[in-house]
Amino acid sequence: MSKIKGNVKWFNESKGFGFITPEDGSKDVFVHFSAIQSNGFKTLAEGQSVEFEITEGAKGPSAANVISL
């Protein structure tokens, strides 16, 4: 699976999800906190640069293996 770079559009810590805007201009991708690859509290900040893979979830594409850049 290829890695894609993008920026966090928004992330709601209390709900544990948000969206990432890919750098290639494609449609925003859903991200769940469980896909964030970090220790401790898993969260993302608006505008943060990330790298991720896209998987096909039940409700459409979602981010997997999200890492901060």
UniProtKB/Swiss-Prot annotation:
Keyword DNA-binding part of the UniProt annotation: yes
Source domain of life: Bacteria
GO CC annotations, alphabetized: cytosol
Gene Ontology terms for molecular function: DNA binding
CSD domain segment(s): 6-66
Gene that specifies this protein: cspE
Identification of the protein by name: Cold shock-like protein CspE
Subcellular location: Cytoplasm
Annotated organism of origin: Buchnera aphidicola subsp. Acyrthosiphon pisum (strain APS) (Acyrthosiphon pisum symbiotic bacterium)
Keywords: Activator, Cytoplasm, DNA-binding, Transcription, Transcription regulation
